């Protein structure tokens, strides 16, 4: 972790490739120094069918899932940096947003934590 999942309208991929988007989201997350670089995971989910305010209007929304322990200020700065980078990349897209969800260390589990 952390996981950065970017939902977007498929048409934004005409401006920048998925690879470019993945790289830039990773770069912003890494630049905060809140996470180990090797732990950062990024995915892009382009949608063909969607509505924004009952209109087919391009959008980008980043969902960040991170382990608890960062301050509100750190999380707010991460969101602002990410939205700014995406706004710079996609100046024509009016709907760019991000939210951060924290999960508890006590309830998190991954395969490497399971004893054989």
Question: Model-derived features: where do they sit?
Answer:
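A domain-level signal for the structural core that forms small-molecule/cofactor-binding pockets
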Residues: 2-116
């Amino acid at each position: 972790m952390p996981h950065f999942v970017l939902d977007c309208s498929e048409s934004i991929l005409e401006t920048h490739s998925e690879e470019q988007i993945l790289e830039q989201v990773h770069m912003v997350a890494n630049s905060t120094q809140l996470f180990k670089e090797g732990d950062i995971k990024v995915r892009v989910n382009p949608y063909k069918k969607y509505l924004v305010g009952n209109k087919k209007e391009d959008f980008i929304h980043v969902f960040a899932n991170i382990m608890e322990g960062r301050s509100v200020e750190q999380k707010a700065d991460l969101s602002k940096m990410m939205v700014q980078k995406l706004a710079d990349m996609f100046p024509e897209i009016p709907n760019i947003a991000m939210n951060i969800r924290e999960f508890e260390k006590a309830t998190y589990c991954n395969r490497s934590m399971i004893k054989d």
